[in-house]
Regions:
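Phosphopantetheine-dependent thiolation modules in NRPS/PKS and related acyl-activating systems
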Residues: 1-92, 151, 155, 204-211, ...
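A hydrolase-biased, glycine/serine/histidine/acidic-enriched motif that marks catalytic-domain neighborhoods
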Residues: 78, 82-353
Length: 353
């Protein structure tokens, strides 16, 4: 068994066979050699693509299925090895504790159209260790029946919130389509006479007109979510089932998904996008009498007013403009800027309470 003493580089080396295998998997996926068993996945450059590769190799080598949100509860080789040694089945849940520590009031973030919470990883960390941060992933992603309306999503997520925080005031936020669900959650809380201390919308429009044809979402899977170019896999004007097969094969060759990632899993993801898009299209926001903050990019300027249309539903909306575009607003260099705006708003709301 390897020694637990730190090596020459200060990293703690693996101490048993499980840690050794996991460390090899992490190094191969991340293409980084200087990793120890106590290094945080996100600190060493981990992303959702890396996480997908790692869980795929773990599935083959250990015969265990780890959900992507494992990287928030077990963010080191050491803690992940503990899960694998325990051999217990991991519960799938909608509410993911992405940063559960801290003394401030928790902030709850709703998933985007993709259904996972990985978009919020950098924002959660940029908010600092004193800000508890929980993310909601879609029920279909978490292993149960998907919710088909925004209202149903909001009801389900409010039940989960109260397991962490039984009474208000609550702090809610959402990026893109997640902001629409957060809005409905605040409206439902008002009906329960439960206060919402903060409602934060990040580059969110109140009304959407998302395409509902399968071809659009197949193309989007190829471009955005699997990192593939349509031209590279020659998808143009081919039937959807052939496109899906080509996407899967190209993604496996590029190690963007595990080798045993099957067509059923890709089909499930496609159905999730279609269901979520239909739910957002059908929803019409209700008036909300509480205060809210809209953090928006300059990109969202195609004829919309400063509030992106939210002024029709509230008189108490503040707007904060931030650089970047819609797809990058909460990641990379933008994450600390958004986090600063969020923290400032939460502090102001707390002082004004």
């Amino acid at each position: 068994m390897a020694s637990s003493a730190a090596g020459a580089n200060g990293r703690i080396p693996p101490r048993d066979a499980v840690e050794l295998q996991l460390l090899e998997i992490w190094r191969d996926a991340l293409q980084v050699d200087d990793i120890g068993v106590t290094d945080d996945f996100f600190d060493v450059g981990g992303s959702s693509a890396h996480a997908l590769r790692i869980v795929g190799v773990i599935r083959r080598r250990f015969r265990r299925r780890l959900p992507l949100d494992t990287f928030f509860s077990a963010a080191t080789v050491e803690t992940m090895a503990g899960l694998l040694r325990a051999r217990r089945r991991l519960a799938r849940t909608c509410l993911v504790p992405m940063q559960p520590g801290g003394t401030r009031r928790p902030l709850f973030a709703v998933h985007t159209l993709g259904g996972t919470v990985m978009h919020y990883a950098e924002l959660a960390r940029a908010l600092g260790p004193d800000q508890p941060f929980y993310g909601f992933q879609a029920t279909g992603i978490a292993g149960s029946t998907p919710q088909r309306t925004v209202e149903a999503m909001a009801r389900r997520y409010l039940r989960d919130i109260r397991a962490v925080q039984p009474e208000g005031p609550y702090q809610l936020c959402g990026y893109s389509g997640g902001g629409v669900v957060a809005w409905e959650m605040a409206c439902q809380l008002a009906e329960m006479d439960q206060p919402t201390a903060a409602l934060i919308l990040i580059d969110t429009r109140p009304v959407t007109e998302l395409p509902l044809d399968t071809g659009y979402w197949v193309d989007l899977l190829a471009h955005r979510f699997l990192g593939l170019s349509r031209e590279a896999i020659e998808l143009a004007r081919r039937p959807a089932e052939i496109q899906m097969a080509a996407i899967l094969q190209a993604a496996q060759r590029g190690r963007l998904v595990p080798p045993d990632y099957g067509p059923g899993e890709l089909e499930l993801l496609l159905r999730h996008y279609l269901t979520s898009a239909a739910a957002l299209n059908a929803y019409r926001p209700r008036p909300y009498r509480g205060r809210a903050l809209l953090i928006r990019t300059d990109e969202q300027s195609d004829g919309a007013d400063e509030t992106l249309g939210w002024a029709a539903f509230t008189d108490l909306l503040r707007v904060r403009r931030i650089g970047g575009d819609h797809n990058t607003v909460i990641g990379g260099a933008q994450a600390p800027l958004v986090a600063g705006a969020v923290r400032a708003y939460l502090d102001e709301e707390r002082r004004g309470a």
